[in-house]
């Protein structure tokens, strides 16, 4: 099975891409819905976990973010929200400019996007949170490299706050 996610769901030339890809790939590319993407992410993550219990899996992609609550190999709540790192960079950090106002606008937009699922997810609860995306892994590695957490420590709110403070000292992503 070959699947395409948010990039092709949103692309204006997605079907053209699929036609070209069909010429070289052995199978048809299936553009999957966001919730199916979330389900597959959860299954992939759950097969790498040794602990049991209810978990929240977060995957921040370029165009979307998937949030999944599940137990063992069974996803219970699956959501795909339109708030990926590339989409938010283009929308709120125009021309690579970094400032508090842009951060604030991005946070407001993220909260608005999350508002539709917040109560359901809070009521469901979870024991652990797992980040599965390159975005989360990069944030984690930066906090370790900067000495804001150690190799065994999780990515914390404190570490993320320090990362934000550090980013705000720069005026542009090129710095």
Which positions does each model-derived feature cover?
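A generic, well-ordered mixed alpha/beta core segment in the N-terminal half of proteins
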Residues: 56-64, 68
């Amino acid at each position: 099975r070959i699947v395409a996610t948010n990039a092709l769901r949103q692309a204006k030339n997605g079907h053209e891409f699929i036609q070209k890809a069909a010429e070289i790939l052995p199978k048809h590319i299936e553009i999957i819905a966001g919730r199916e993407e979330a389900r597959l992410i959860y299954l992939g993550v759950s097969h790498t976990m040794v602990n049991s219990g209810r978990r929240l899996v977060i995957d921040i992609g370029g165009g979307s973010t998937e949030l999944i609550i599940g137990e063992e190999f069974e996803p219970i709540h699956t959501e795909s929200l339109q708030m990926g790192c590339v989409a938010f960079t283009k929308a709120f950090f125009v021309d690579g400019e970094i400032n508090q106002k842009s951060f604030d606008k991005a946070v407001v937009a993220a909260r608005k996007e999350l508002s539709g699922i917040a109560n359901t997810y809070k009521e469901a609860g979870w024991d652990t949170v797992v980040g599965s995306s390159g975005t989360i892994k990069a944030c984690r590695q930066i906090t370790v490299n900067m000495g804001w957490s150690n190799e065994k420590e999780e990515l914390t709110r404190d570490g993320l706050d320090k990362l934000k403070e550090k980013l705000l000292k720069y005026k542009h992503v090129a710095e």
